[in-house]
Amino acid sequence: MKTDKLLFLAAAAACAGTACGKTPEKPNIIYLMFDDLGYGDLGCYGQEKIETPNIDALASQGILFTDMYSAAPLSAPSRCCIMTGQHMGHSQIRANYERLVPPESLGWNAIFLDDTLEGQQPMLADTPTLAKMMQEAGYKTAMVGKWGLGYPGSESTPGKMGIDYFYGFNCQSLAHAYYPTHLWENDTKIATGNETIMQGEPLPEGLDPMDIASYERYTGKFYSSDLMYDKLENFVVENAGRPFMAMWTTTVPHSAVQAPLDEVMHYVEKLGDEKPCTDGGMYLPNRYPLATYAAMVTHIDTQVGRLVAKLKELGIWENTIFIVTSDNGPACNGNSPMEFFQSGGPFRCRQGWGKSSLHEGGIRMPFIVTWGSRLTPSKTAHVAQFTDLMPTFADLAGVKAPQNDGVSFAPILLGKPEKQQEHEFLYWEYPSAKGWLAVRVGPWKGLVKRVIKGNGKMELYNLEDDPREDKDVAAEHPDIVKRMWEIIEANHEPSPLPVEKFQMNLPQPELPAEE
């Protein structure tokens, strides 16, 4: 009897963990990453003007991260860090870099007339990636949206980096167009039916800048966000019976700001009339740039609602992890809608403090995770970075991750926050925009600007008391500054790619005097 009882208990334990012999079901993963969306651009993060009801609903059902960071403040390096799990001191792609730079006489927009120029610097052919890891775990993988990590035909196209199905923009420069002449489906260039629309030019003289009809020349027949959403939904439907990972790397709301006119007019009625952008400063002239920006974000939010409904219809919603985030902070150029919408949320976000900077406005990201009804709705102040995605997905998929700089946050998703490991530190470097370095340790953030100019003076902020980074307290805490520099020196390595733009030498540290 005692032996029978022990056997029964052992069998019951096995059933509890594996559904009586069946392998535990691996969750599907949908990773929606906006492009240049600010921390404060979603309703669930405090936005009051842009409507995002479907994403807000996800936040109310899942976990909202308050301290999630991009690993880089710009598109290509951010995406490289996600794919490799490496922080910017170890990663390959450390800046945006076109593989073929057009002659200055042609101008930056020459790529819209000569698509043989398209594409960016590729990663190395043997690079371990998050997508390859998920393939090894038995997942079907897709990316719909923007790639930007290797030109067509290179050793670093989506298909060669672990993506089973790709549809969208190979080239991030061409991704600035919402009515493109072509998109890529795997390695095949697909004509969209749109005519070429040149960017970076002002509204022609003689046209009335206050007349919406003057801007019709900048609209095509087929809106890229709709073309890509349809492919995403098709992928989900076709793979509903097996584990899948879909990376939805939308180009919204990156300039040029464009959206369907009826959706723009909704916000014109809501926000009122506004000054048009006529100089091409947002890549294209636009009669209602603020209303259009808002309409773009809401357009994707509506698609989120459609996709959630489809997942429920297919019966796979309860086993689908749905993540919403952004690649980096909002653009802060002279025509940016960022100030009007307070896109930086609680963080200072102005010229030099958003995208392309390592201030909080450039790297602190909205980050929402839902998993059917499995998660207890909550907020977490766990400090995390995009490098954590690789080990987290590995834990969820039951596979060993390649070497990476991340810390899995799977315990938070699995309802075991007491087992969550914390980062000893987060590290950033960025060799563009005069060069930046940053480290976060607990509430402390060290920041070095103008690194390429040889500046070695670190600013220090206590983010708990000063999230806007207003008060530099480095002089009061020389011991913390010294520790930050030790972390920098231990984590900086040259990029393995022979691209000068990716390299940055460390300056001589200027340490504050100890009392």
Predicted features along the sequence, with ranges:
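Bacterial N-terminal signal peptides that target proteins for export
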Residues: 1-7
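Bacterial Sec-dependent signal peptides at the C-terminal "C-region" and cleavage site
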Residues: 14-25
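Loop/turn elements at helix/coil->beta-strand transitions in domains of secreted/extracellular proteins
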Residues: 25-30, 61-66, 135-142, 161-164, ...
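Conserved beta-strand->loop/alpha-helix structural units within folded catalytic cores of enzymes
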Residues: 34-36, 137, 144-146
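Active-site-proximal cap/lid insertion segments
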Residues: 34-50, 64-66, 94-98, 149, ...
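Active-site segment of extracytoplasmic enzymes that catalyze sulfate/phosphate-ester chemistry
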Residues: 39-139, 153, 175, 189, ...
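Short Gly/Pro-enriched turn/cap motifs at secondary-structure boundaries
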Residues: 71, 123, 338, 355-360, ...
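Short, surface-exposed beta-strand/loop micro-motifs that present aromatic residues
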Residues: 131, 234-235, 435-440, 445-450
